[in-house]
Every structure is written in structure tokens, then in C-alpha cells.
């Protein structure tokens, strides 16, 4: 999409709150090699942050908690964005229209693919924990990659609504389950994407059988939160003692893959 040929081309940034911990500026500044500015726009109010984008920036990345609000502002949305119902990229076209894209799902697909080896026997069930913007992108990614996708969220209605939209929009194999089914699907899943900012009590109630899994031992556990993960090193060590085939994938891998997608 052609951008306005003026000084706005030189200025990029990130909106969200809080974002002082974000690694995005370092990643994008390295990629741009000093040619463009990349700012953290750390404003708690979405409308104020969005106005700053309109006034000063050509393209912005969007992170929590603004992905849904930013999506609502777009004049044109990509197919991926439409399916996810959230955006992590907003850009201005030369005619002034705002275009929304989403590279979060590329982050999920890339991080999972990087950690699956040919000899791994892995269940084609994916468990997505949460139903915010990151979880929606994760569910879309696993659906596109051929996984039977189960979304579990504290607000069951929200998860059910999104699962239905995935089925209707893309004919995907997606469903929602209540939190009471967490241990069952942790056991059945080959891929688990954990997007909640907190360590939920259901994690502490997993049995050894749940962690070992069926029908095969290999599991990919991808966590969205790279700054303050819900799984400590000790947690991962405990899980791996029970299931040596469990691979924990840090949120930084997700971030890196989505940043590459956003940069492109």
C-alpha cells in the first residue's frame, strides 16, 4: 500500500499501555538501520494515542489493550485482520484512509513451526488459553495450520462467539470450552498457546497424566507474555520432569516472528 510521500514516511511507533518494557523499538530500529524513527507512544487513553498517530505517524504497531479499538478505526482491513477482529498494524494511505493489518498470527505460526522437528509425533489439537487479541490471533493461526482448535477462557460466551466466527468465516475447526475442561484439553493438545497475563489456578491442578498427554508425549507450550511470563523456569523444569517431550517456547519468539511480518 503506497504511503504518503512526505515526512510521515519517516516516523513509526507503537501504541499500547503499559509499553515501557517493549522490545519492539530495538527490533525495528535495528531493521530500519537509522533511516526511520520508531517511538514508544505510551499513552493510557486509546483515543489520545490514536490522535497522535493521525497527527504524527505513517505507520504504528498496536499492542494490548488497544488491538480491538484500533481495529474499529480502520477504513480497510486485511482478511487476516477481519478473521481475528483485532489489529497490530495501522497505516495511512495517501488518500487518508486507514488500513489495518495483523501479523500476530504469523508470530504464532512461525514460533510453533520453529520448534517442531520432523521426528516429533504431535497431536493436531491446539489449546488456546484466553480470548483477547493475542489469543484470537493464536486461534486463527492454529486453525490455518490445520489444528483442531479449542479456546478456553474465563468468559465462556466471548470464546464461544469467536469460535463461531472462525467456523463461519473460514470454515475452520474451532470450538470453545469452559475453564472446567482445561485439564482435559491440556492433556489432548499437541500445541498449547497461553495468552493470559496471570498464572491460573487450573495450572496447579494438572495431573501427571494431563502433562504427559495423549496420544503422544510431545507438546509445544507457547506463551504470549514475554516480559512477565506466567511460567517460571522452575515451572518448566517441573513440567519437563514429568514430560521430557514438552517444549516451552518463550514469547520473544512470537514477538520476533510477528515483527518480521510487520516489517515486511
Put a short name on every predicted segment.
Residues 2-118, 228, 233-234:
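Phosphate/diphosphate ligand-binding glycine-rich loop within oxidoreductases
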Residues 6, 120-122, 143, 206-219, ...:
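Short, conserved loop/helix-junction motifs that constitute active-site signature segments
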Residues 12, 125-126, 149, 221:
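Conserved hydrophobic helix-helix packing surfaces used for dimerization/oligomerization
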Residues 16, 100-105, 112, 116, ...:
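Glycine-rich adenosine-cofactor-binding loop
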Residues 63, 195-196, 224:
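Short, well-ordered coil/turn residues at beta-beta hairpins
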Residues 69, 199-222, 231-234:
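Rossmann-fold NAD(P) dinucleotide-binding segment
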Residues 152-161, 165-166, 178-206:
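Active-site rim beta-loop-alpha module in soluble metabolic enzymes
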Residues 220-264:
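Rossmann-fold NAD(P)-binding glycine/threonine-rich loop
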